[in-house]
Amino acid sequence: MMIVLVTNGPVPYRIPALNRLAALPGIELHVIFCCRREPNRHWDLPPIEFACTYLRERIIRIGDRYIHNNPDVLPALRRLAPDVVITSGFNPTHLYAFAYAWLHQVPHIVMTDGTYDSERTLSLLHRMVRRLVFARSAAFVWASLGGQKLFASYGIAAARCFRACLCVENTRFAERPGASEPPFDFIFCGRIEPVKNPGFAFDVALATAARLRRKVRILYVGDGSEQARIEERAARHGDAVEASFHGFASQQDLPPLYRSARIFLFPTSWDPWGVVANEACAAGLPVLVSPHAGAANELVVDGENGFVCDLDVQAWAARAELLLSQPGTYAAFSERSLSLVRGFTFDTASDGIMAACRHAAALRRQ
């Protein structure tokens, strides 16, 4: 079976699952990338072990969004003659690929990291496009329960939907024997931009220090436009909070950084999932997360391995105080993080994509 996936660009949390898919007997996987890297992405990538094509980059920027318009996807598809076409978005390039599949009677699969909540504000036109594509697609792949809810909202039967979770290499983040006490109380990992609320994380550290009546330490991993403002605040409140800024970290540097802290703060205003939560859980950290992350109430379960809280500083600080002052509670939450994240693996993700492809191919034979 020749499977062609058309997607924006290579991302570290999907490549290992695609490598596994490509290694399956009887499977030829070819991934068509719209670009080598979107301008706001700074991650490093694991080895790519599948065939791929990089289209000539044609990117339109609208605010923080990047729109891909690559007509050369059509000759690439004609050359590959796929048995199944998967698209992971609704940029013009993805729609060209969908049109190819429909016109050539090739089964089409919709794959999304999006959620019901992340798409609630879409325009009527965007919804109409989705209805058109969904009505002519054979199978659907979701990354989170929010994605499952999204497909259900369009009336798509559960039997046509398959899970391909977002994940990391869990074993890389596991605690090493003989590890010392983590020097940081908190870690914030991600782009230091307003949508991620890094300043809120500092406010939580400050309020927690007041509750514990001691100085707390927070580590920022990442970079962005908000860093200077937080550094200025940290200088003013140095008696209560010690803030350290690591800057951008490569994938290989991340595990010890997570293990250097006790609690992961994830106060995002918008994240369809949030792979940083996988990384934190794999390192055994309890997670405080806003309800605006797709991982909330799925990977991070309120009261089990963390807390899902609205963006209220004192509410977050109260929960942080509980974890930092109750060793038994902390240990239980830490162990539960390790347990929950075991269900999020690259093998599981690969199996979900393969199941969707088999379902789509079976429909073609009918």
Whereabouts are the PLM-identified features?
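Conserved donor-binding/catalytic core segment of Leloir-type glycosyltransferases
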Residues: 4, 178-206, 219
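A short, histidine- and acid-enriched strand-loop-helix "catalytic/donor-clamping" loop
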Residues: 106-124, 136-139
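Donor nucleotide-sugar binding/catalytic pocket of nucleotide-sugar-dependent glycosyltransferases
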Residues: 131-175, 181
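Nucleotide-activated donor-binding/catalytic signature segment of Leloir-type glycosyltransferases, i.e.
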Residues: 231-249
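Short alpha-helical donor nucleotide-sugar binding micro-motif in glycosyltransferases
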Residues: 248-249, 256-261
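Aromatic "clamp/platform" in nucleotide-sugar-dependent glycosyltransferases that forms part
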Residues: 269
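Short hydrophobic beta-strand element within catalytic cores of glycosyltransferases
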Residues: 286-290, 300
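Conserved acidic donor-binding segment of nucleotide-sugar-dependent glycosyltransferases
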Residues: 301-314, 322-327
